[in-house]
Amino acid sequence: MADAAAPDAASVRNFTINFGPQHPAAHGVLRLVLELDGEVVERVDPHIGLLHRGTEKLIEQKTYLQAIPYFDRLDYVAPMNQEHAFCLAVEKLLGIAVPRRAQLIRVLYAEIGRILSHLLNVTTQAMDVGALTPPLWGFEEREKLMMFYERASGSRMHAAYFRVGGVHQDLPPKLVDDIDAWCDAFPAVVNDLDRLLSDNRIFKQRNVDIGVVTLDQAWSWGFSGVMVRGSGAAWDLRKSQPYECYAELDFEVPIGKNGDCYDRYHIRMEEMRQSVRIMKQCIAKLRAPHGQGPVVVDDHKIFPPRRGEMKRSMEALIHHFKLYTEGFHVPAGEVYVAVEAPKGEFGVYLVSDGSNKPYKCKIRAPGFAHLQAMDFLSRGHLLADVSAILGSLDIVFGEVDR
């Protein structure tokens, strides 16, 4: 009788559940369909597109200046890094050189964006596995950094501060002093986080040997950024293909050797320290005599004249009117420019037909390539490990769905 009641092995089906799209550990509007054999993950099927807005198509209907704010809304955790890629692409087509002071300001704010992103990721990754203190410490520092964003651009998140040919306006000396003071105090916060998490028994159990990816697998999946460096490759576009003034800055590229969640956490922690190092060098150069000067290219066919000049000169008024109605024309051609964004290689493939609007702007989002490997990374792990793996990928849906 007992044998008759026992289920036949062939009739036992795997259990399918939904993870998200309103899940607190989903890091946005992610829906994962998980196929489970007990607690073990057999298959992960990511469903994306819930935040799709047609960004690439919208950019085709805007002038080059109007397109910049769309890039803030991709990886909205570190907005200026995306603007950077687009501006570099347009500048390459125009064949213009950015003034040195503008380059230093761009690099300074790109590194602020990197710290903003890594702080959010490291602390929420800790929260995903049960540590509730780090997010409180991390958000306190992020608040200060977003104030620096606001003081430079007027906006905490969607800055639209970078311009083709430079940046919108110069930084006041008091702001540079405050950023310098913050750089002196911040390493102590990273050390506190390090002490709290790095040797914590529970944190290590949840991250060591979880979501392991070898270097060959990382390359074949199209990984970049921390995902590749965690597997042992010192591939950082700031070093391998330097842009702006990165070639003259002194910093290290941290790499891991195991390719697991724990290594990726350590790399992000060390990258925050290196970013502070870069910021200190930028501030020193901004204060030096050779760091003074204009913050935008001196060409009124690309960047509008000052308001005071516009009220005195008819030519300046015409330039201003033409730039804000028609915009500037970019020579026909195509270009691919990539920057080392906090999430990985953020690329812009820009095609111009010689008009005042992009013919095509293809965006290469690093998170998109990382998310496609979610099934590969999660198979054979327990259900509880899915949120740890997802946290270590550092996914933001603005750039994945665009």
UniProtKB/Swiss-Prot annotation:
Pfam families: Complex1_49kDa
Enzyme class: translocase
Enzyme Commission number(s): 7.1.1.-
Protein's recorded name: NADH-quinone oxidoreductase subunit D
Main location: membrane
A GO molecular function held by the record: NAD binding
Family named by the database record: Belongs to the complex I 49 kDa subunit family.
Entry keywords, A to Z: Cell inner membrane, Cell membrane, Membrane, NAD, Quinone, Translocase, Transport, Ubiquinone
PANTHER family: NADH DEHYDROGENASE [UBIQUINONE] IRON-SULFUR PROTEIN 2, MITOCHONDRIAL (PTHR11993:SF10), NADH-UBIQUINONE OXIDOREDUCTASE 49 KDA SUBUNIT (PTHR11993)
Oligomeric form and interacting partners: NDH-1 is composed of 14 different subunits. Subunits NuoB, C, D, E, F, and G constitute the peripheral sector of the complex.
Main function: NDH-1 shuttles electrons from NADH, via FMN and iron-sulfur (Fe-S) centers, to quinones in the respiratory chain. The immediate electron acceptor for the enzyme in this species is believed to be ubiquinone. Couples the redox reaction to proton translocation (for every two electrons transferred, four hydrogen ions are translocated across the cytoplasmic membrane), and thus conserves the redox energy in a proton gradient.
PROSITE patterns for the chain: COMPLEX1_49K
GO CC list: plasma membrane
Entry membrane topology: Peripheral membrane protein
Keyword Transport assigned: yes
Lineage, top ranks: Bacteria, Pseudomonadati, Pseudomonadota, Alphaproteobacteria, Hyphomicrobiales
Catalytic activities: a quinone + NADH + 5 H(+)(in) = a quinol + NAD(+) + 4 H(+)(out)
Species name: Rhodopseudomonas palustris (strain ATCC BAA-98 / CGA009)
Cellular localisation: Cell inner membrane
Highest taxon above the source species: Bacteria
